[in-house]
Amino acid sequence: MELDLEPTLKPLIEQDTLKWIFVGGKGGVGKTTTSSSIAVQLALQHPESEFLLISTDPAHNLSDAFCQKFGKEARKVEGLSNLSCMEIDPEAAMSDLQQQAQQYNNDPNDPLKSIMSDMTGSIPGIDEALSFMEVLKHIKNQKVNENDSKDKISYRTIIFDTAPTGHTLRFLQLPSTLQKLLGKFQQLSGKLGPMMSMLGGGAGGQQDMFEKLNEVQKNVAEVNEQFTDPELTTFVCVCISEFLSLYETERMIQELMSYKMDVNSIVVNQLLFADDDENPCLRCVSRWKMQKKYLDQMAELYEDYHLVKMPLLGTEIRGVENLKKFSKFLMVPYDPKKDRGLITEMKEQ
């Protein structure tokens, strides 16, 4: 039975229960533009609620997309009072973790400290794990009024602008990575604890550190439960209409399904819609022919997905006003004949 799903993200934008939205795909397909557009539409459609857009990609682009500098602290978007952005720095998170370890044990000769440093640098996915720990820390500590520790912002939905596919999939494997890390630490604590004490290691400091790791694991396990609940979490795939991008999208969807994560929306960017051009160039016609071929394949392969088709514009999509104009096609399908003027009316930033 063929499903006739709406080719927009309107159901996602209007869903009341979503707490987490991940946006990911191959590098260079427009993930940041898409995640920014989703965040803008959420803020516009629900002005009474607060939203947070987080970049976990080391090559941050949110500042460029909004023409506004963001950092590791959540900052309000100028022109949208209920949307905040932040850019997570894994290197800074690693440095913070090492500093915290030194606070628990300031003995430079403690062998456990050296072992821990080697382990945290060698376990696959540790960068992504640290990024997520940083996310949890900032969400927990974010306040409406910095002078009132009890008055915290309650974000209706948090949107993740993720790194290219491989990093994103490791990011979503975070709970197992942390469990592996914590298990090794606990094993070392049990086997080497007495020896560390004999060598001068601070048993009390080590115990405090392991208790903190247990707390982190508990918090992450709770978030992981939410990640596998389709009422709370969904993943939006972003691609372009080319073979390699389609192949990568299918691979990513299969992996996401293995994590039991909900994914039912695909945004296809940079479409030319050359059939409706009054004076199309030969190169545009040729590329549009190729794009249509892969669009047809996607329509057949993902008939039970919301397949959103977004146009290639004549300029970069930067700034809140341009994002507002572009993002409306997440809610209402782009019409090449009626909406053609949008391609040239965007203001360069």
Curated annotation (Swiss-Prot):
SUPFAM superfamilies: P-loop containing nucleoside triphosphate hydrolases
Family annotation (Pfam families): ArsA_ATPase
Record GO terms (molecular function): ATP binding; ATP hydrolysis activity; metal ion binding
Location relative to the cell: Cytoplasm; Endoplasmic reticulum; Golgi apparatus
Enzyme Commission code: 3.6.-.-
Active site: D57
Tagged with keyword ATP-binding: yes
InterPro entries: Anion-transp_ATPase-like_dom, ATPase_ArsA/GET3, ATPase_ArsA/GET3_euk, P-loop_NTPase
Record note on quaternary structure: Homodimer. Component of the Golgi to ER traffic (GET) complex, which is composed of GET1, GET2 and GET3. Within the complex, GET1 and GET2 form a heterotetramer which is stabilized by phosphatidylinositol binding and which binds to the GET3 homodimer. Interacts with the chloride channel protein GEF1.
PANTHER family: ARSENICAL PUMP-DRIVING ATPASE ARSENITE-TRANSLOCATING ATPASE (PTHR10803), ATPASE GET3 (PTHR10803:SF3)
Protein name: ATPase GET3
Species per Swiss-Prot/TrEMBL record: Lodderomyces elongisporus (strain ATCC 11503 / CBS 2605 / JCM 1781 / NBRC 1676 / NRRL YB-4239) (Yeast)
Lineage, broadest ranks: Eukaryota, Fungi, Dikarya, Ascomycota, Saccharomycotina
